[in-house]
Structures are given as C-alpha cells and as structure tokens.
Amino acid sequence: MIKSGFITIIGRPNVGKSTLLNSIMGEKLSIVSCKPQTTRNSIQTILTRDDFQLIFVDTPGIHKPKHKLGNYMVKVAESSVKDVDLILFLITPDVEVGKGDRYILEQLKKENIPVFLVVNKIDENPQEKVAQTLKNYSEIFDFAEIIPISALKQKNVKELVELMVKYMPEGPKYYPDDMITDKQEKFVVSEIIREKALRLLSKEVPHGIAVDILSMKKNSKGLYNIEATILCEKESHKGIIIGKKGAMLKKISTYAREDIEKFLDSKVYLEVWVKVKKEWRDSDRLLKELGYK
C-alpha cells in the first residue's frame, strides 16, 4: 500500500489553478491563458512516485453561467468537490474575500474534507498584503493548512506536494506509473491548440472558440498527421483567427505544434482550419461531439 488519493483545485477564475497543476506535474496538461474560465473539462492528472499517487481534478472557475457550456462548466466545478480526499482552495492576495468565496467556503464546511488555503502569486504582492489575506481567510474558515506559493516560479510547490501526500489515505495505485492523464491524446492536443489561440487572439474572440480534432494518425515513420478545426461563432471572428494573409492562424499552428510534439514526444504535421458554427456553446449536439458533455 502507498499514500494515494484524489485532490480537487477550486477557486475564482484566473487565480492560477491550471498554472499550479502544470507546475506540480511538470507537464502542460491543463490549458493556461490570461482569460478567465479557460478550463472546461474536469481534467484528471496523475502524479506518481514510488511511495504515493496523487490524482488531481482541475475544474473550471465557478461563475454565473451565461449559456449551456457555462452551465456545464459550473456543474463540473461543483461536482468535483464530492468524493475527494483533499481540497485546495486557491486564492490570490490582491482580491478581497467576496460573497462568492464565503458561499463556497460555507458549502465546504458541510463536506468533512480537509481544505488547504493556497495563496498564489505571492511574488507579485507585498508581504503585508499576503499576511493580511491569510488573516482574513483564516478568520472565516478552519483550514487544515495554509500555504503561500508562486505557481509560476514554483516557489513552495514542492512543499505543497509533500503536505498533500501527508493528508492522503493509504491506498492502491489507481493508475499505471507512466500514466499522467486519463484524457485521450486527442483531447490534450485540442486543448493545446485552444490555449495557443486564446493566448494569441485579442479580446474580440473571447471564449467562443473550440477545437475539433478531425483526424490524428501516426505513420510508419512515427510522424503524427493531425487535422484540426477551430470553431468560432461569428464570421468576423473567423477573419481575426486567420489574420492578414493567414499570419495569425500560422502562428497559432506553429506554437501549438511545438507543444504537441513535446507532449507526444514525436514529430507532428499539423493542419488547422477555421469554421463558423453559430451559437455552438448552446448546441447540445456540438457540446457532446467536442467532449464537453
């Protein structure tokens, strides 16, 4: 028997949930962007060592839904706090305790699950601000541990992992040693492309994009041929994504290919198109096809 269990990361949009998960794993498995609510699926990632296995559930930021996709994202976030062994409540020092935070913490009091207060981005805020934030939150909830970190610079991340292991029950290895995610390769590839698009595009094209992997085949020489379509909701968005003389689409494809090659540990030929699908975020059929339901 080893130490093994399930952990969920929750918090406001854009507090660094995906960055923290990637920092812990050393792999870019969860989409990272400067835009809120960029994580859509509850991605399970697995960190395995000789004496422990931690299974992370990365959730969308809990927010007021505006469409069916938003409803799905909130449902995933709320369901992810059930049946786990530990909850990481992630915050940043620059944001005051709000009604939403109090609501979530009130719900967590009912769960009888240990909760860590993880304060991210401490390198971007004065020590006095960090200390005050810790005090404010500790007054409204009895956290099992309080850990200030910088996920981006990996400050105190190793110490956080050690503390998480300490709180895990004894159990089996739920996944093979070499498995780092329970999602199919296609899903991770689509998320990489979507991340690059979100990172490079302006605010004119917010969350109204998805990536559909049309084909993903490996030839006899070990080269992956991948065909993908970026779906957007408006013709004007299509033009922005493609860019002048195709420059933006080429940039998205190039950056995505580099990360996909690292993930697959193989050379990749990537071809990406752009297609308009009006109101795809409210289409049950499309959401199901894209793996969001």
Swiss-Prot record:
Boundaries of every KH type-2 domain copy: 201-278
Name of this protein: GTPase Era
A GO molecular-function annotation: ribosomal small subunit binding
Domain of life: Bacteria
Family membership: Belongs to the TRAFAC class TrmE-Era-EngA-EngB-Septin-like GTPase superfamily. Era GTPase family.
Its membrane topology: Peripheral membrane protein
Subcellular location per the Swiss-Prot or TrEMBL entry: Cytoplasm; Cell membrane
Protein species of origin: Clostridium kluyveri (strain ATCC 8527 / DSM 555 / NBRC 12016 / NCIMB 10680 / K1)
RNA-binding found in the keyword field: yes
Function: An essential GTPase that binds both GDP and GTP, with rapid nucleotide exchange. Plays a role in 16S rRNA processing and 30S ribosomal subunit biogenesis and possibly also in cell cycle regulation and energy metabolism.
A Pfam family that the UniProt record links to this protein: KH_2
Region (G3) location: 58-61
Gene Ontology cellular-component annotations: cytosol; plasma membrane
Lineage: Bacteria, Bacillati, Bacillota, Clostridia, Eubacteriales
